[in-house]
C-alpha cells in the first residue's frame, strides 16, 4: 500500500511539472493572427495597376522586426503574423531606380533618387519612377478570436506628380544629336508615412526629352517642387549638335510651377518655354552624345499628353 501511494504521488507530481512546462511554452510562443489585406484602387484613375504591392508591418514595440509581404498584381490576399500592435506602409514594388532609405523606421522611411552629374558637371538627381502607396498609423492585432480573420483595407494614392514640357522657338533642330533637360527647386525624396517632402531639401532634376517636329517635348515624374520658400524653378536645356558643340539655354518657370494648385505635394504641371535660338552647326570639342554619369541608370518611359 505504501509503495502504491508513493507511486501515485510521483505520477501526479510528474503530471503537474509537465503541465507547467507546456504552459510556459504556450506563453513564450507567439500567437499568430490571420489578416486579409484588401486594396481599394478607387483613388488611382490616371495609371494602370502596378506589377505588385509591398506591405510592411512595423511592430510598435520593435520597429526593426518588420514583417514584409508582397501582393502580385495588387490583388487582395491573406497573411499571418504575430499578434501585436502595428503601423503599416504599402507601396508598389515595380520601382526600378528608387533608393529606399531608413526602411527600418515607420516615421523615417524615405523614397529617394540617385545622384547624377549633368552635362555641365553639376550635381543633380534622377527623376523617380511612378509611385503609389498608403499608410495606417494604428493596426491592433490582439485578442482575435480563433478562426476569425482581421481585415485591413489599404487605399493606394498617387505619390508623384507628372510634369510635361514643350520648348518652342528653336531653329535647326535637325542638327540636334542629343539633349537633356533639368529643373531646379525640386524635391528628390519623399517621406512615406507622412506622404510629405523634406522641409530643407532643394535639388535639380535631370531628365530626357525628344525632338518632335518643330518642338522639343518631354515628361517625367517628380515628388514635387521644393518646400523651401523662395527657391526658383529654373528650366535648363542642354543641346548637343552633331559636331559635338553643346548649347545651354535656361528660363525661370517658377510662376508656371507654383500657379498649379497642389493637394499636399501633388500637382501635375505642363511647362511651356519659348526661346529664340538657332542650334549652331560649327564643330565642338566633344562627341555628339552626352556622357551622363549615374549608377544603375534606368530609362523611365512616360506617356506625354499635350
Regions found by a protein language model. Name each.
Residues 2-3, 13-43, 295-303:
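Bacterial Sec-dependent N-terminal signal peptides
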Residues 30-36, 53, 84-86, 161:
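Short structural boundary motif marking the start of a folded domain
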Residues 54-102, 177-258:
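Tryptophan-paired
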Residues 67-158:
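Short, low-hydrophobicity acidic/polar segments
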Residues 230-306:
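Hydrophilic extracytoplasmic domains
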